[in-house]
Regions:
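Glycine/serine-rich phosphate-binding loop and adjoining beta1-alpha1 elements at the start
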Residues: 2, 8, 75-166
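An N-terminal-biased, well-structured beta-alpha scaffold segment characteristic
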Residues: 5-103, 107
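Glycine-rich phosphate/diphosphate-binding loop of Rossmann-like nucleotide-binding domains
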Residues: 6-45, 153-249
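Glycine/threonine-rich flexible loop motifs
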Residues: 12-17, 78-82, 91, 229, ...
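A structured beta-alpha segment of the ubiquitous adenosine-cofactor-binding alpha/beta core
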Residues: 54-64, 74-75, 221-256, 260-273, ...
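Rossmann-fold NAD(P)-binding glycine/threonine-rich loop
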Residues: 95-123, 265-318
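Adenosine-phosphate binding glycine-rich loop
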Residues: 115, 121-159, 290, 296-371
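Short glycine/serine/threonine-rich phosphate/pyrophosphate-binding segments
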Residues: 174-182, 200-201, 259-260, 265-270, ...
């Protein structure tokens, strides 16, 4: 099969879907890999690195003219204009974006959105959400440390003692856990909150304190456990109690990192304007939920702003700020998914009996398959 890797055209997107490491493996399996010139430059991968492993370098038309096209972000209308029907497109194709899925269906492509892979042990190696969230959690702390005008670790010097920074992490998924681990390495004192009781042990294993809000009803406990590794909307009674508890900790925090997302919905508000007003001047909020509206109503997606003396970072694509490693992990996720649709005997196989393939299939034969 001919596999194309076009350059990403989304503003601020620096990642690339194939690295020389994964290109080499695809070529060893008998495939031809065509990379658009410059596709990997922003991720520190020059054209020569692809050529060294046997990949072809071409223009956008050559990459898009392939049997399979590997992307990071969902294609724009202009990219799909010359695509032949039946082309397979694999990437982070926004499964909850109905307009985008219809655009893919209208182009006649067979589209696989890797974000839709089930949260199962078998699918772990192709879990793009986790691989990219890991990097996002790390970078969130590094940005916070950069914006915060004090030190993270406690420092005892002849000139006096500097207190360790207090960091609050709201939402303890993959990004939140990595944020805790990174902040801990920098010497901060960390508290973390999440609706799921099962993460308490993970939080404490990383050296942070879990902000515990007891459940008073069976309904609250059931909702907190979530579905498929994702959080579910919580009952209002529990949210009110959590909000009060979190508000106390936010007021004491020097840095707050929010990571709470619910698939297909606007991000829940965790840090209200009143909470921001209660924070010390010079404190920092890094809102990882900015792409879905933000966990703080004062967040401005794509911007860093100062409100009520607090710096609020609304960066919408943190993994793209660590493009080389983000691309490396993402490319391995893509490679593992391709093993499911490119059997060793050759050709393309869309096996809907495979739960991962079925979950990721968004469009086929001009129809939107996702329900």
């Amino acid at each position: 099969m001919r596999i194309g890797v076009p350059a990403e055209i989304t503003a601020g997107e620096t990642r690339v879907a194939v690295t020389p490491e994964t290109a080499k493996k695809l070529i060893a399996q008998g495939h031809t890999v065509c990379v658009q010139s410059g596709a990997g430059v922003a991720a520190s991968v020059p054209d020569a690195a692809y050529q060294a492993v046997g990949a072809e370098i071409g223009d956008a038309a050559a990459a898009w003219g392939s049997d399979i096209v590997l992307k990071v972000r969902t294609p724009a209308q202009a990219e799909l204009a010359g695509v032949k029907p039946g082309t397979v497109v694999v990437g982070m194709l926004e499964p909850y974006n109905a307009e985008g899925l219809q655009r893919l269906a209208s182009a006649g492509v067979t589209a696989f959105a890797l974000e839709a892979a089930p949260r199962t042990t078998r699918a772990q190696s192709m879990d793009v959400l986790s691989s990219q969230a890991n990097i996002g959690g790390y970078k969130a702390v590094m940005l916070a440390a950069d914006k915060y005008q004090r030190l993270f670790p406690m420092l005892m010097t002849a000139a006096g003692t500097i207190k360790a920074a207090r960091v609050g992490v709201l939402g303890v998924g993959v990004a939140g856990l990595q944020a805790i681990a990174t902040a801990k390495r920098l010497g901060a004192v960390i508290e973390a909150s999440d609706v799921r009781p099962s993460v308490k042990e993970q939080v404490e294993s990383l050296g942070a304190k879990f902000i515990d809000v007891p459940y008073e009803t069976a309904e609250e406990k059931e909702a907190a456990e979530g579905v498929g590794g994702y959080a579910r909307p919580m009952p209002q009674s529990w949210l009110d109690r959590q909000k009060a508890e979190v508000a106390k900790r936010v007021a004491m925090a020097d840095v707050v990192i929010t990571t709470a997302l619910i698939p297909g919905r606007a991000a829940p508000v965790l840090v209200t304007e009143d909470m921001v007003k209660s924070m010390k001047a010079g404190s920092v909020i890094v809102d990882l939920a900015a792409p879905q509206g933000g966990n703080c109503p004062l967040t401005e997606p794509g911007q860093t702003v100062t409100k009520h003396g607090v710096v609020i970072v609304g960066e919408t694509n943190l993994p793209a700020l660590v493009a080389a490693d983000a691309s490396s992990l993402y490319a391995r996720n893509v490679l593992d998914f391709l093993k499911l649709i490119l059997p060793k005997e050759g050709g393309l196989k869309v096996d809907l009996e495979d739960d991962i393939v079925a979950a990721c299939l968004m469009t086929q034969n001009g129809e939107v398959k996702r329900k």
